[in-house]
């Protein structure tokens, strides 16, 4: 559920800006003898996403290509020459499909992954479609009363299953209902006791802002977690 790729694009841009700072520091005060031909190590090929909407998939790929082109121009200013770059040679790994039904291991082997992040859809049990109910049940079938959970909880369970035996770190923006009331016992107890999930950081409830005309007031939290070892926790 990567949508139009906002999270992926912003993450890519942030990492490339950091990389450009490193390149600039390495070149600072030096006389460049010959051309620096391949200084870039961060590429859009290192970013993966799953999205059910075919149009959003196209938008996400395009956004990443544009971001890559923009950052390439910034790097060229630092190395003072044109780099060999054709955007369409780069491959943005955005896959069209249902993120709760797909095998994430087939999209990217978990041993090659470091971070999972996103803003999965929030849909309360009273507003879910039949298809969404089936999605959630397929992921949470071993969790009693899972039908009462918000649709977004499926991503926590799916991620926790995928992350077993790794040091992957994950974080999701979610409706704050997952940390209140009945949802706490239904969702978090099996995640803690059976999947050995550890919360690494949490961002307190905030109101989701949107430019939509008829936007609803949605109260959100951000929860970061791992199923591997964790050194610190932050609130």
Q: Which residues does each predicted region cover?
A:
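Class I SAM-dependent methyltransferase "Motif I" SAM/SAH-binding loop
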Residues: 1-5
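Signature of N6-adenine DNA methyltransferases within the class I
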Residues: 9, 16, 57, 65, ...
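Post-Walker A helix-loop "phosphate-sensing" segment adjacent to the P-loop in P-loop NTPases
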Residues: 17-22
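Conserved SAM/SAH-binding beta-strand->alpha-helix loop
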Residues: 53
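Conserved SAM-binding strand-loop segment of SAM-dependent methyltransferases
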Residues: 92-97
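Surface-exposed acidic, glycine/proline-enriched linker/cap segments
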Residues: 24-42
């Amino acid at each position: 559920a990567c949508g139009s790729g906002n999270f992926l694009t912003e993450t890519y841009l942030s990492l490339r800006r950091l990389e450009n700072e490193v390149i600039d520091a390495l070149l600072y005060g030096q006389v460049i003898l010959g051309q620096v031909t391949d200084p870039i190590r961060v590429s859009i090929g290192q970013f993966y996403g799953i999205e059910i909407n075919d149009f959003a998939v196209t938008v996400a790929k395009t956004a990443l290509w544009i971001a890559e082109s923009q950052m390439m121009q910034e790097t060229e200013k630092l190395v003072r020459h044109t780099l060999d770059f054709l955007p369409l040679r780069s491959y943005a790994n955005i896959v069209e499909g249902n993120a709760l039904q797909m095998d994430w291991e087939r999209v990217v082997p978990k041993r090659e992954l470091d971070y999972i992040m996103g803003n999965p859809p929030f849909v309360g049990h009273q507003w879910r479609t039949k298809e969404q109910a089936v999605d959630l049940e397929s992921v949470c079938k071993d969790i009693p009363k899972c039908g009462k959970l918000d649709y977004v909880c499926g991503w926590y369970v799916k991620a926790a299953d995928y992350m077993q035996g790794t040091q992957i770190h994950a974080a999701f923006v979610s409706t704050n209902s997952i940390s209140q009331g009945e949802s706490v016992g239904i969702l978090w107890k099996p995640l803690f006791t059976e999947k050995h999930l550890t919360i690494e950081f949490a961002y307190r409830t905030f109101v989701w802002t949107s430019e939509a005309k008829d936007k609803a007031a949605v109260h959100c939290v951000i929860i970061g977690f791992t199923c591997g070892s964790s050194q610190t926790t932050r609130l």
